[in-house]
Amino acid sequence: MTSIKNAELGWNEAGTPVSDQFDDVYFSNVNGLEETRYVFLKQNHLPERWQEFDQRRFVIGETGFGTGLNFLAVWQWFNEFRRNHPDAALKELHFISFEKYPLSLADLKKAHEAWPELAEYAEKLQKHYPAAVPECHRIVLEDGAITLDLWFGDIKDCMPQVPYNEQGLIDAWFLDGFAPSKNPEMWNQNLFNNMAKLAKQDCTVATFTAAGFVRRGLNEAGFAMKKVKGFGTKREMIAGSMEQREKQSNHLAWFNRTASSNLDSIAIIGGGIASAALAKTLVRRGQNVTLYCKDTQPAEGASGNRQGAVYPLLNGPHTGVSRVFAPAFLFARQFVEQAAQEIDFDHDWCGVTQLMWDDKSTDKLEKMLEGNFSPELIRKLSAEETAETIGLSIDMASVHYPMGGWLCPAELTRGLITQLEKTELFEAKFEHQVESLTWDEARELWTLNANGQNFEHSTVVVANGNEFQTLSQTEALPMGQVKGQVSHAPATKTLSKLKSVLCYDGYMTPVNPNNQHLCIGASYDRSHLDYEFDENAQRDNVEKLVKCIPNQEWTKEVDTSGNLSRQGIRCVSRDHLPFVGNVGDFETIKMQYADLQNQAEEEVEAIHQFPNLFCFLGLGSRGLSSAPLLAEVLASQICGDPLPLPVDVLTELHPSRMWVRKLRKGKAITEL
């Protein structure tokens, strides 16, 4: 992944931050907030347009985040709009912004001191301000009324990666940044063309500059721009709107993603962390959700463990795995912290330490470190630093995830479902095994057969983990199943000193003070897909610890002889990435794309997918780190909202990706 550098800045006599990279102020020395309101809010006709807006979500795009002043100002105005117009159709504000050199958190806080009236908003932003990790970071605020998608990286690289469909995405553009004379690399026709691609019809745009080449470039891109009075002593600025948008999308036909055409009622089949996170984000969007779970309560499957590690799955630079799991982990932190304000579940951000316990693991971790990840995310520790970090004697180097930790997935999942059941938009049907799905073309409804009863829904999401093969629409998905057994060991005086989750050829968690046990695991068994206790797995879990950390007496204190354990079956993919999105019609795709290798990209028809049927599967061992963000991805797709991952990363999550890859190579997919 391309490393992100924080902004280098100074502060002038007026206390205004000044960029060292661009030798320009971040906002006006005098009345910076009033200038923002005049240039970007008023010239985009806000809040007047909000009163007339007939959709649930209004989307603003901004070309330079900087200190976040524009975002904070529009957030303040939108909250006032919500208070004054509680019955308006518009309920949510979505702000998409780009920043090549993000401010450090310390500099951001200092800059925000200039606007005391925005302090309550600034503090909420600061709480979830992301580490300097490339690409999109979604921040959900005000229980979903405000969403910020903050893209870190060069705008010329990031903007084409923002997913959009034929209708466009942006309702209003804030064309902001350092002055064109200070940052000529940004202000060019490529930028204006990309703004047009993302714009909806009638999208407005405003910018502080009156430079002729900017006005002409925006006009050429399809906007109708004009000069208007500038703020204060500035004579002119320019503003306008999209005159005629060309219909286009940046989703490849064979990886097409479509929203649901009918959101009247959404069914989720499952009962684990994926289902709970998805239900929460859909209900937050005002959707009616019914959960169908085959068990007596949530989290009886793979999400039922006492302790699960939360840290990102990273590997070499520029891989789909790293580009999914780095932002997903940061969003999981946000999700967990927000959930902890409302429900009780055991968790501890104690860090995660991954040991370089042999040559192979050392080579793998050294290669991972070549990804130039932010030290806020991961850093290498010497043997001495490792021992100090974990609190136990050890003589090997490691990599440490300082923001990682552990949580109780069973308590989190059940807490989320219990919280949702208090709302009028959610219903859970336990002991309801969905045995079949049938699409009624005439009525455009799905019929779910469960326990001999039929239930009708307009949209269905299959999130039932290793049970995916029980439904004909998802049984062909190329996923595997792996049994895992986690062992529980009682605390000892020495083991209670462990201060970090420890990963090697297995993992061990610190002692949970609420039950005085730790977890050690987990086995991988593809041959026995049952939920029975396995003596060999119980023994192997301890033996792996002793093998990887030899000559340390404390490893011998891990006692699993009481046979305390838990079994689960993971749903896994070959490429370690989940399946999130529309469910493809396997039999039809085989015929539709039989000659795909010989077709030009522009000739390919959109992949055939079941109407209003989606899946959320294959989370493997990393559901705690990935489920919250991927739930956002899927809920956003279903509802037609902006998606929080780059468009080429979304292809790596497409449920039909493995079929398409084979077909493009001229290979048959009959044996998948």
UniProtKB/Swiss-Prot annotation:
One CC-aspect GO term: cytoplasm
What protein am I looking at? tRNA 5-methylaminomethyl-2-thiouridine biosynthesis bifunctional protein MnmC
Cellular location of this protein?
Cytoplasm
Spell out the residue ranges making up region: tRNA (mnm(5)s(2)U34)-methyltransferase: 1-243
**Which cofactor(s) does the record list?**
FAD
Task: Kindly give the Pfam families that the UniProt entry links to this protein.
Answer: DAO, Methyltransf_30
* Reactions listed under catalytic activity: 5-aminomethyl-2-thiouridine(34) in tRNA + S-adenosyl-L-methionine = 5-methylaminomethyl-2-thiouridine(34) in tRNA + S-adenosyl-L-homocysteine + H(+)
Q: Does this entry carry the keyword S-adenosyl-L-methionine?
A: yes
Q: Which NCBIfam families did the record assign?
A: MnmC_Cterm (TIGR03197), PRK01747.1-2 (NF002481), PRK01747.1-5 (NF002484), tRNA_MNMC2 (NF033855)
* Primary location group: cytoplasm
Question: Keyword set for this entry?
Answer: Cytoplasm, FAD, Flavoprotein, Methyltransferase, Multifunctional enzyme, Oxidoreductase, S-adenosyl-L-methionine, Transferase, tRNA processing
What Enzyme Commission number does this protein have? 2.1.1.61, 1.5.-.-
Q: Which GO terms describe its molecular function?
A: flavin adenine dinucleotide binding; oxidoreductase activity, acting on the CH-NH group of donors; tRNA (5-methylaminomethyl-2-thiouridylate)(34)-methyltransferase activity
Q: What is the source species?
A: Vibrio parahaemolyticus serotype O3:K6 (strain RIMD 2210633)
Residue ranges annotated as transmembrane are none
Family as reported in the entry's similarity comment: In the N-terminal section; belongs to the methyltransferase superfamily. tRNA (mnm(5)s(2)U34)-methyltransferase family.
Xref: InterPro entries: FAD-dep_OxRdtase, FAD/NAD-bd_sf, MnmC-like_methylTransf, SAM-dependent_MTases_sf, tRNA_MAMT_biosynth_bifunc_MnmC, tRNA_MNMC2, tRNA_S-uridine_synth_MnmC_C
